[in-house]
Amino acid sequence: VTADDAYTRLDDDDYPAYTMGRAAEMLGTTQGFLRAIGEARLITPLRSAGGHRRYSRYQLRIAARARELVDRGTPVEAACRIIILEDQLEEAQRINAAYRRATESAKQTAAA
């Protein structure tokens, strides 16, 4: 690993840089909570060579959203399902917007 690679990873939201303990500390939660959302398949941490869970910044943002919902009284399983559905809705909206742009572009090309 070169120094350039190491610095690039600092900006990589998907790089699994955080141990379970550090991730829990950053989120103000417990390692048990991180295990629970992992078991609910909301996030799947990568494993280090020694088998320890490692989390990315992207995964920590998802975990933070789950924690918000749980702190408001939503059961963990339901919070995970809500986040998954929110993500699916966002993806569907993105696809629909791209389709609309392509359709409008095709109509303008045909009219010209």
Indicate residue ranges for each PLM-predicted region.
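Short coil turns linking two alpha-helices in DNA-binding domains
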Residues: T30-F33
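Arg/Lys-rich, alpha-helical DNA-contact motif
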Residues: T2-T19, E25, E39, T44-P45, ...
